């Protein structure tokens, strides 16, 4: 934390630990009882389905690339969420940074919230890094599949070097960022190796979020889904790394034991896609509510 800009550190500490966790949690509990429904700790939003890459097995690709939530629609979701006690917002996509100007405006308007953004990082430049430094409440989670060969094979030739440049820029600006890594039946050993982990530490990452490959979306490849034995191997590797390395690791699927099982359906989070459909999970594309036709509370009270 000594390498993070002190004003950014202060803002994130207040927004995450006080607003999202202390104040927010008590408001969520109150509203769960009041409205007899789940109220999430975090809301995932797709600002857009557009993306500048075309990655193998992308769960978001089935939406196409022409859907968008407007600035006012995202702003309304955040306003409604804060009334329920939600101060943590996570952007997925598409590539959220194709809407970088709107995202910065939302950071400015809702300076009491934390905004985490899953991004391929290829659109992070010095101007945007300076804007992040100014608003202080935006954290990228950068997608990497391991080394250069593994990343480029899924995300396109030259992607890895663009990502590394973005990581170096963020580190130079003293901005916190993390990594999002998808492990498969092919890369699960490499992506949890000491070599990979140490390289991320050296480049200034502060956390890593692991997801196992889900065969949905564009050009899905079921053979890449890790088998139970491979998932068990990753389970133990992540716990070893978490205990021995200064880079905090989270495993989206295998850490369910720490949060009482599945967190979807508004229990701890929900997903709103770029068409406004409210899904229980980013990997479960079923919805009977659209944020353009109902309030956030009404969506939470719906059967799905």
Regions found by a protein language model. Give the residues of each.
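Short, solvent-exposed cationic patches
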Residues: 291-304
């Amino acid at each position: 934390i000594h390498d993070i800009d002190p004003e950014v550190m202060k803002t994130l500490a207040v927004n995450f630990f006080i607003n999202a966790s202390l104040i927010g949690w008590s408001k969520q509990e109150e509203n769960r009882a009041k409205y007899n429904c789940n109220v999430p700790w975090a809301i995932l939003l797709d600002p857009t389905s557009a993306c500048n890459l075309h990655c193998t097995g992308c769960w978001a690709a089935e939406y196409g690339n022409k859907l968008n939530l407007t600035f006012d629609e995202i702003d309304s979701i955040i306003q409604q969420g804060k009334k329920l006690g939600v101060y943590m917002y996570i952007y997925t996509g598409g590539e959220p940074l194709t809407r970088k100007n709107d995202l910065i405006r939302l950071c400015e308007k809702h300076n009491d919230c934390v905004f985490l953004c899953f991004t391929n990082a290829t659109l992070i430049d010095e101007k945007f890094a300076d804007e992040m430094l100014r608003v202080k409440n935006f954290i990228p989670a950068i997608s990497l599949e391991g080394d250069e060969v593994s990343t480029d094979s899924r995300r396109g030739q030259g992607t890895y070097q663009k990502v590394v440049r973005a990581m170096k820029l963020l580190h130079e600006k003293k901005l916190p960022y993390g990594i999002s890594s998808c492990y498969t039946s092919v890369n699960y050993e490499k992506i949890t190796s000491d070599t990979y982990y140490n390289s991320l530490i050296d480049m200034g990452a502060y956390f890593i979020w692991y997801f196992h490959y889900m065969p949905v979306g564009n050009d899905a490849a079921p053979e890449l889904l890790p088998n139970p034995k491979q998932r068990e191997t990753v389970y133990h590797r992540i716990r070893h790394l978490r205990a021995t390395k200064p880079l905090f690791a989270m495993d989206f699927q295998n850490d369910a034991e720490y949060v009482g099982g599945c967190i979807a359906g508004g229990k701890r989070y929900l997903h709103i896609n770029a068409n406004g459909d409210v899904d229980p999970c980013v990997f479960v594309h079923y919805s009977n509510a659209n944020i353009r036709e109902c309030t956030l509370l009404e969506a939470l009270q719906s059967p799905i």
